[in-house]
């Protein structure tokens, strides 16, 4: 019997449905993982070292390819839209961002310079990067231009 992916429940921001992750086309590291993040909700992934917490988050933000990993089954939706086939920068553009453990900024740079380091490998033109930077300031007005 064929299994179909469940539809995003009303009010869910993220729906992960029965995903499978494989590294190097051989090593199965996740199988049958599902979770829902309701709008306004908080969800915690708990487990021992090596249980797949970070891999699940990397699957959601589509950062697995950098480590030769891929989602081979299931689906990942953000606001009822499939995002598992999008590039990482498109996932970010839609509002899903993974913040890694620890501090990943350069202390000698300003906030704006740190933000611009993330644009270093983008193929976008300066105007698009400037628009994205303005959007960040709109999301986080407490940063303000005084701190740049």
State what each model feature region is.
Residues 46-48:
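The feature captures the beta-strand-to-loop junction immediately N-terminal to the Walker
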Residues 75, 80-81, 127-145:
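Conserved ABC ATPase "signature" region
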């Amino acid at each position: 019997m064929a299994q179909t992916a469940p539809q995003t429940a009303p009010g869910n921001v993220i729906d992960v449905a029965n995903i499978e992750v494989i590294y190097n086309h051989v090593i199965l590291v996740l199988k049958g993982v599902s979770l829902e993040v309701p709008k306004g909700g908080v969800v915690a992934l708990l487990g021992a070292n090596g249980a797949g917490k970070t891999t699940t988050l990397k699957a959601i933000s589509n950062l697995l390819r950098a480590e030769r990993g891929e989602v081979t089954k299931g689906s990942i939706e953000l606001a009822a839209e499939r995002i598992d086939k999008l590039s990482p920068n498109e996932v970010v553009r839609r509002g899903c961002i993974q913040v890694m453990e620890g501090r990943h900024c350069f202390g000698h740079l300003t906030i704006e310079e740190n933000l611009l380091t993330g644009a270093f490998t983008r193929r976008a033109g300066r105007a698009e990067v400037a628009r994205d930077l303005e959007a960040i300031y709109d999301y986080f007005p407490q940063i303000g231009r005084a701190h740049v």
